[in-house]
A protein has these predicted regions:
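Short, glycine-/small-residue-rich phosphate/pyrophosphate-handling segment
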Residues: 92-143
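Mobile gating loops/cap/lid regions near enzyme active sites that modulate substrate access
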Residues: 143-150
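N-terminal beta1-alpha1-beta2 submodule of the flavodoxin-like/Rossmannoid cofactor-binding fold
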Residues: 1-90, 150-182
Length: 182
């Protein structure tokens, strides 16, 4: 999902930094889930997000798996580390949006995106959800962001519906950020 959003942002004219947050879960817990372990192994060399990355950006698209209807602890930890930047007002007036994935259709996708946005309210950020601004949103059905159901084994591939929704979200975020920047 993140790679698709990054590519769509670039196609919309943005300079993009694709980052991940540091993995904080113990290795034995990760090893107990084959899909998670594989993901960690394939992304281990990707750059971890820093405060400088969010300061650099005019717009931020956060992606997180859903954990019990909430933001994953790794992303929450990154957001919590931005207290100094928040206190200095450096996170305000940026565009923010989110995307998520769950194993089940009612696995907390909307509550996760809403919880993610709680920090953005405190930042003074500008949340740019997709809403129902394009007919394709009636197919994916999530006005708060984009969500994907991975299935019980976390292996369900993204569909054209989700690819289109991710493209729309990224394009919308880039467009609105550009309008705000002038």
């Amino acid at each position: 999902m993140a790679e698709r959003v990054a590519a769509a942002g670039e196609r919309a004219g943005a300079e993009v930094r694709l980052r991940q947050v540091a993995e904080t879960v113990p290795r034995d817990v990760i090893a107990s889930n084959a899909a998670w372990s594989n993901h960690v192994d394939t992304t281990r060399n990707g750059p971890d997000a820093t405060a400088d990355d969010i300061l650099w950006a005019d717009a931020v698209l956060f992606g997180t798996p859903t954990r019990f209807g909430n933001v994953a602890s790794q992303l929450k930890g990154y957001i919590d580390s931005l207290g100094g930047q928040w206190a200095a007002g450096q996170l305000a007036d940026k565009v923010y949006a989110g995307f998520t994935a769950t194993q089940t259709a009612h696995g907390g996708q909307e509550s996760t995106l809403l919880a993610l946005y709680n920090a953005v309210y405190h930042f003074g950020g500008i949340i740019v959800p997709p809403g129902y601004t394009d007919p394709l949103k009636f197919a994916d059905g999530n006005p708060y962001g984009v969500s994907h159901v991975t299935g019980p084994s976390n292996s369900a591939p993204l569909t054209d519906v989700e690819f289109n929704a991710l493209d729309h979200l990224a394009t919308r975020v880039v467009t609105i950020a550009g309008r705000l920047k002038g």
